[in-house]
Amino acid sequence: MDELKIHKLDEVIESFINYLIVECGLSRNTILSYSHDLQAFIKFLLSKNILDFQDVRPDTITSFIISEKQRSLSINSITREVVSIRMLFKFMLSERKLQRNPLASIASPKLWKRLPSVIPTYKIDKLLSIFDIKTKIGIRNNAILELLYATGARVSEVAAIQTDWINLEYGYMKCRGKGSKERIVPLGTKAIEAIQNYLNTARPKIKNSQNSTYLFLSKGGKPLRRENIWVIVKNCALKAGIKEHISPHMLRHSFATHLLENGADLRSVQEMLGHVNVSTTQIYTNVSKQHLKAVHRQFHPRE
């Protein structure tokens, strides 16, 4: 890594801090706050091998916001960091040290509050690898979490699934969503394996299972309610050593975001999620924007 470039980043920050002290007359605590925020930003830039503020793009800022959100920083802390970065860029523009403002197209903090919480893929892997598949409940819980992540289904939709809504041969599942609207959602290989194992080895051992048409049953043979599934997901996250709050809806968010990050088109994701309007699905493009922008930079002939 180019030490001169790293030094150049620090030089710009130093000039900005001097400006805040001399020109703006800000208090020591405010100066320290700006400095702390900007050092966090520089650390992020270096992790992405960005060694010059000229190379910062809007998707870099979006990626930074998501990174801070995944570190469980509060919205207020992230907003303060972005305000500090915005002030830095305004200073650089006024000093002709920056040609364009990467923050110009970034939405207001109100939008960030609406950004879905997404579970990183490495934590998904941890979450899906903790089950005791020698017990009927472990096998059932494994099937539930694999299905949640594989389909992006709402927790209420998963609780309502009937056994004949699943077609493992063709790898599809019927979902009944809001307003009783039905949709067909593909199942991935891992989810098919987990559900097949549950149907073959665990569900038949559950009390009164032969008398129920519901896919997921409690120990007593009653259909699992959505509240039960919330508790299952929460307990599985704790068992996996994940300290952050994890919910079924976060698995839905992660399903959509990870699909978009890996190149899925928005309309297909909309259909799988059961959104009536594509604008509802577009919130996930704000989360995965850094990936899409990178694809554009790599493949567009005029980029």
Q: Which residue stretches match the model-derived regions?
A:
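Conserved catalytic core of the tyrosine transesterase superfamily
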Residues: M1-E303
